[in-house]
Curated annotation (Swiss-Prot):
Domain spans labelled KRAB: 16-87
Keywords: DNA-binding, Metal-binding, Nucleus, Repeat, Transcription, Transcription regulation, Zinc, Zinc-finger
UniProt name for this protein: Zinc finger protein 735
Any coiled-coil regions, as ranges: none
Family, as annotated: Belongs to the krueppel C2H2-type zinc-finger protein family.
Lineage summary: Eukaryota, Metazoa, Chordata, Craniata, Vertebrata
An example Gene Ontology biological process: regulation of DNA-templated transcription
Zinc finger (C2H2-type): 157-179, 185-207, 213-235, 241-263, 269-291, 297-319, 325-347, 353-375, 381-403
Function summary: May be involved in transcriptional regulation.
Length: 412
């Protein structure tokens, strides 16, 4: 069972509770934190709780943890004057602690010292360090504390370079592991190693197929609360992220961010090869394959390869005969949504594509593209045999018959 230290100057140990390491905020303090800091707070509190649980503590789940697991705003935000109680553990003389060693073991290596200048009587050093100025590491930690032991800054666990202010029961070995990359925690089943208890616990949930979060609507279970929240939005149709410009709503903030670029015209992803810019990173990835010639998506049926996955999906329908897009007007079916969209224009008589040069309108984008070659004189289709060029692919096909001597048209 994890222990906690007694009053200053005492070596007596008592039982450690979650409240000892829980950090609570007043409403004003909580509103001062930005989104990233609030997320950091959630992560730290959940990790602390899991660490205590993994050490064999049999406690009922606190309301604060229940709220945080459901991504809710903490309901019991209040002022908790714990800033002066957070000790500093010297990482300079820290010994490597094995995962089997409990928080009790690490606390037994720590004794209370008093810093008269800053008035914080519960700051702690390793036994081997008698004074704060004994090593450069302590000096740095002490100076930082003297400058910024304000409630909010201390509560969000700010790190100055490599000198970190730990909460009362943190194991500094875990902090060091983040810098050194050492992974002391091992999964007994598969042997995979981790730096932190929370990462090990998360991994164990996956390979044991334990799904703690259940949808009340359909009974489906999930490994993580965030996955459950995501699933619920699909069922309810909830779209909480709304564009202020046009009112369109989205399920995820990332979708709203991408959508806003339509209004701003922002294209942050630029091709280093040709300079063309795109709104989405995935579009840039697909575009780069034009330059590299890479075609990673291959048809298992005929071996034909494609640069984008969607092109392979459409191609496979040639083999299967699947035509999932049906015209409601005439019942004709198509294997591609864009082909259906083009077809519908036949019924409406709409001609949405206009030539900027002469004003002529067309019902298909490919038709207006071909038409523009009349104005530009562009001839993109070239005969490999004689280098003669043509505006349209059909003209090139007819021309090739001259070289092959083929006579495809037969009198019946």
């Amino acid at each position: 069972m994890a222990k906690r230290p007694g009053p200053p100057g005492s070596r007596e140990m008592g039982l450690l509770t979650f409240r000892d390491i829980a950090i609570e905020f007043s409403l004003a303090e909580w509103q001062c934190l930005d989104h990233a800091q609030q997320n950091l707070y959630r992560d730290v509190m959940l990790e602390n709780y899991r660490n205590l649980f993994s050490l064999g503590m049999t406690v009922s789940k606190p309301d604060l943890i229940a709220c945080l697991e459901q991504n809710k705003e903490p309901q019991n935000i209040k002022r908790n004057e714990m800033a002066a109680k957070h000790p500093v553990t010297c990482s300079h003389f820290n010994q490597d602690l094995q995962p089997e060693q409990s928080i009790k073991d690490s606390l037994q290596k720590v004794i209370p010292r008093t810093y008269g200048k800053c008035g914080h009587e519960n700051l702690q050093l390793k036994k081997c360090c008698k004074r704060v100025d004994e090593c450069e590491v302590h000096k740095g930690g002490y100076n930082d504390l003297n400058q910024c032991l304000s409630n909010t800054q201390n509560k969000i666990f700010q790190t100055h370079k490599c000198v970190k202010v730990f909460s009362k029961f943190s194991n500094s070995n875990r902090h060091n592991a983040r810098y050194t990359g050492k992974k002391h925690l091992k999964c007994k089943k598969y042997g995979k190693s981790f730096c932190m208890f929370s990462h090990l616990n998360q991994h164990q949930i996956i390979h044991t197929k334990e799904k703690s979060y259940k949808c009340e609507e359909c009974g489906k279970s999930f490994n993580h609360s965030s996955s459950g929240t995501t699933h619920k939005r699909i069922l309810t149709g909830e779209k909480p992220y709304r564009c202020e410009e046009c009112g369109k709503a989205f399920r995820w903030p990332s979708n709203l961010t991408r959508h806003k670029r339509i209004h701003t015209g922002e294209k942050p992803y630029a091709c280093e090869e040709c300079g063309q810019a795109f709104r989405r990173s995935s579009t840039l990835t697909n575009h780069k394959r034009i330059h590299t010639g890479e075609r990673p998506y291959k048809c298992e049926e005929c071996g034909k390869a494609f640069s984008v996955s969607s092109a392979l999906i459409y191609h496979k329908r040639i083999h299967t005969g699947e035509k999932p897009y049906t015209c409601e007007e005439c019942g004709k079916a198509f294997n591609c949504s864009s082909t259906l969209k083009t077809h519908k224009i036949i019924h409406t008589g709409e001609k949405p594509y206009t030539c900027e040069e002469c004003g002529r309108t067309f019902n298909c984008s490919s038709t207006v593209k071909a038409h523009k070659r009349i104005h530009t004189g562009e001839k993109p289709y070239k005969c490999e045999e004689c280098d003669k060029a043509f505006k349209w692919h059909s003209s090139l096909a007819k021309h090739k018959i001259i070289h092959t001597g083929e006579k495809p048209y037969k009198c019946k």
